[in-house]
Amino acid sequence: MDLSSLEIFRAVAHEASVTRAAQRLQRAQSNVTTRIRQLEEDLGVELFLRDGKRMSLTERGSEFLAYAEQLLALADEARQSMHPAEPGGRLRLGSMESTAASRLPALLASYHKACPRVALEVSTGTSHALFDGVRARRLDCALVAAGPGWAGELDGSGLRGEPLFREELLMILPAEHPPVHDVAEVRLRTLAGFARGCTYRQLAEDSLGTPLTVQEVGSYHAILACVAAGACVGVLPRSVLQLLGTPPLRSLPLAEVDTWLVWREGYATAAFERWRGVLGQAGD
């Protein structure tokens, strides 16, 4: 087992395909297949279930992926530590959809200009999923929303964090809904929102109370479309609403929520520290 084998295994696991993994790694497909087979023989377990061209992780494969991610992350940290004055290597950044849409583009452009040798990998998800991703070393750092009791979540988690931005969270309602001045006046009992683990959704659920039906969608465009259709309410930051532009809707201030940067305690590569600097300048 070597780092090259782990990189190949991770690529196949993420792509669920030998063909796509080979393209991503710029390797021959036969080489990828052989290396996966050799790794399985070395470990004495089956890592993948084969269904035609689709590759899905077995239970043991999922367990091994967590270790592979940690080993590869540590190896990358070790490489970067040898050249602290020249940020390079890889930085795996997690972000909420709202931050990725409204704030990240300009920040990533500034960072790439300052650190062109760093390969940035950006993925999006709910705050809960991103928090877990950093803790499990699938991500190096993440931008998450700080909900109620946030400070307590960091205690004993092995993670550190710092606040960056404050977002004004709005509840949006169909244009035909009667004017409201308080959440208690909202008549609709269906909420369009992201999957569980989204801090904004949780704040909306807590404010609206029960009974409440949640219609899970995958994007802010979908939330806006559902609300405009008149069947439900939604929540999103004002910055996203201004960015996307909307059909005529009503809006109601719901809360102010801080966006935090979180990372593993002790993680301090040159690439990450430069990223913290870019974020700090934007948050000032």
UniProtKB/Swiss-Prot annotation:
Residues 18-37 bind DNA. Disruption phenotype: The PA1225 gene, encoding a quinone oxidoreductase, is the most highly up-regulated gene in cells lacking NmoR. Residues 1-58 form the HTH lysR-type domain. The keyword DNA-binding applies. The keyword Transmembrane helix does not apply. GO terms for molecular function: DNA-binding transcription factor activity; transcription cis-regulatory region binding. Keywords: DNA-binding, Repressor, Transcription, Transcription regulation. GO terms for biological process: regulation of DNA-templated transcription. It comes from the Bacteria. PROSITE patterns: HTH_LYSR. Represses its own transcription and the expression of nmoA, a nitronate monooxygenase. The nmoA-nmoR intergenic region is the sole direct binding site of NmoR across the P.aeruginosa PAO1 genome. Other genes seem also to be under negative control of NmoR, especially PA1225 and the hemO gene. PANTHER family: HTH-TYPE TRANSCRIPTIONAL REGULATOR, HTH-TYPE TRANSCRIPTIONAL REGULATOR GLTR. Belongs to the LysR transcriptional regulatory family. This is HTH-type transcriptional regulator NmoR. It comes from Pseudomonas aeruginosa (strain ATCC 15692 / DSM 22644 / CIP 104116 / JCM 14847 / LMG 12228 / 1C / PRS 101 / PAO1).
